[in-house]
């Protein structure tokens, strides 16, 4: 073995003899590999392994090294430098690397990482077909947070092969991490070469001139796969057809199957031409990814005669938007925009009688009239009560208002009820 580098302590020999069932051990003797495969790719196989020091299962990745790289001391040095760089990454949404070494005899790069009990996002979505958009938003936030960290490095680290197969999840607590940092790309030693998975490649990546925003495009394709459970461009016949559609800037057929306008808009922002494409930081601030439990309030500057309180405001919770005006002491005119069962947005204007109506009774009536899901009822009721609490301080809400976030000239305030 040459270029051996493993962050592992030397282990004493087992008192009871050799471990049974393992295939090989790392140079330091800390990790042992079993023959059980947990994942594989064109040049890589991932096995289940065991950390004898910590007593936990880990993943052992073996990637084949091209002969042209093995025969070049310069390229091998560059490969080893890249591995060392990846080992310095420390982030909650980046896969942890525990040890690594190059086996010159077997012509492989060996990397020990944490093991994800639920596999990749691709495997997880195939197993669990019914996933709420709220959960997928949490996954998206974690992926973007990891990308934001990578892209903030000096110089920026570009994944180049981001896809759901390279994003891993522990299903028991929903933690998502980015892994598999395209070592095959560095093994080829062509930084600007066309390497990766074609279906997830940004058009500019095909030209060889790109920046970290290629990862955002790939993230958009990941979102598309998460939402539709369809692999991008699965409608195409062969790689040449896929290449042509990407080169022409045509989106996968799966994109046009998305009924939710807000989801489509978010994905479209990720797939935009590079000059218009948002960064990870910008996407994390998008309204689409904001906490649905928050009620965002925009206060209109018009003031009542005493100058103390606004007579109009706009509230938003998830995809629901409510605005209105207090006309007289006992009467309020409200306007609500909401997603209907078909995925389109509908708007309705209605009066609210302060002496006869309650937020809950109105919400129940709307759910029945427009065929909305039962989840819509508490959202509508909370928006109405929050609106009235802001404009009529003495109003007593009939549902719990978890959190109201008001944005105005005086900055941000948070009021919990």
Curated annotation (Swiss-Prot):
Transmembrane segments: none
UniProt xrefs under InterPro entries: Kinase-like_dom_sf, Prot_kinase_dom, Ser/Thr_kinase_AS, WNK_Ser-Thr_kinase
Keyword Transmembrane helix: no
Protein residues bound to ATP: 113-116, 163
Catalytic residue positions: 180
UniProt KW keywords: ATP-binding, Kinase, Nucleotide-binding, Serine/threonine-protein kinase, Transferase
Top EC category: transferase
GO BP annotations, alphabetical order: intracellular signal transduction
MF-aspect GO terms: ATP binding; protein serine kinase activity; protein serine/threonine kinase activity
Domain Protein kinase: 32-289
EC numbers for this chain: 2.7.11.1
Keyword Cell wall biogenesis/degradation: no
Family membership: Belongs to the protein kinase superfamily. Ser/Thr protein kinase family. WNK subfamily.
Name of the featured protein: Probable serine/threonine-protein kinase WNK9
Organism: Oryza sativa subsp. japonica (Rice)
High-level lineage: Eukaryota, Viridiplantae, Streptophyta, Embryophyta, Tracheophyta
Gene: WNK9
């Amino acid at each position: 073995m040459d270029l051996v580098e493993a962050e592992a302590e030397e282990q004493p020999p087992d008192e009871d003899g050799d471990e049974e069932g393992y295939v090989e051990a790392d140079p330091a003797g800390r990790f042992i590999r079993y023959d059980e495969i947990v994942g594989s790719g064109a040049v890589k196989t991932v096995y289940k392994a065991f950390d004898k020091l910590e007593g936990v299962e880990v993943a052992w990745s073996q990637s084949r090294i091209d002969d042209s790289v093995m025969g070049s001391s310069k390229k091998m040095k560059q490969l080893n430098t890249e591995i060392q760089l990846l080992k310095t990454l420390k982030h909650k949404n980046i896969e942890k690397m525990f040890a690594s070494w190059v086996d010159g005899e077997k012509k492989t790069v060996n990397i020990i990482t944490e093991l994800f009990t639920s596999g990749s996002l691709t495997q997880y979505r195939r197993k669990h077909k019914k996933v709420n958009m709220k959960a997928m938003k949490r996954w998206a936030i974690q992926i973007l947070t990891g990308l934001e960290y990578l892209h903030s490095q000096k110089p920026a680290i570009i994944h180049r092969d981001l896809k759901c197969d390279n994003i891993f999840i522990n299903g028991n607590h929903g933690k998502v991490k980015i892994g598999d940092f395209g070592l095959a790309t560095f093994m080829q030693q062509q930084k600007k070469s066309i390497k990766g998975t074609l279906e997830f490649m940004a058009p500019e990546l095909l030209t060889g001139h790109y920046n970290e925003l290629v990862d955002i495009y790939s993230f958009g394709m990941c979102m598309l796969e998460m939402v539709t459970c369809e692999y991008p461009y699965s409608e195409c016949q062969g790689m040449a057809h896929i290449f042509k559609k990407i080169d022409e800037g045509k989106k996968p057929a799966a994109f046009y199957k998305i009924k939710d306008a807000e989801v489509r808009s978010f994905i479209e922002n990720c797939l935009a031409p590079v000059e218009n494409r948002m960064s990870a930081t910008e996407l994390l601030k998008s309204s689409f990814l904001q906490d649905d439990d928050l009620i965002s309030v925009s206060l209109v500057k018009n003031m009542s005669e005493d100058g103390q309180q606004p007579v109009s405001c706009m509230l938003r919770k998830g995809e629901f938007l409510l605005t209105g005006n207090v006309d007289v002491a006992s009467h309020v005119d409200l306007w609500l925009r909401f997603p209907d069962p078909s995925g389109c947005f509908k708007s309705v204007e209605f009066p609210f009688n302060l002496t006869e109506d309650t937020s809950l009774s109105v919400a129940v009536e709307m759910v029945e009239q427009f065929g909305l899901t039962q989840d819509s009822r508490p959202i509508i009721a909370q928006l109405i009560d929050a609106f009235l609490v802001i404009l009529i301080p003495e109003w007593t809400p009939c549902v719990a208002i978890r959190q109201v976030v008001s944005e105005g000239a005086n900055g941000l305030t948070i009021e919990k009820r």
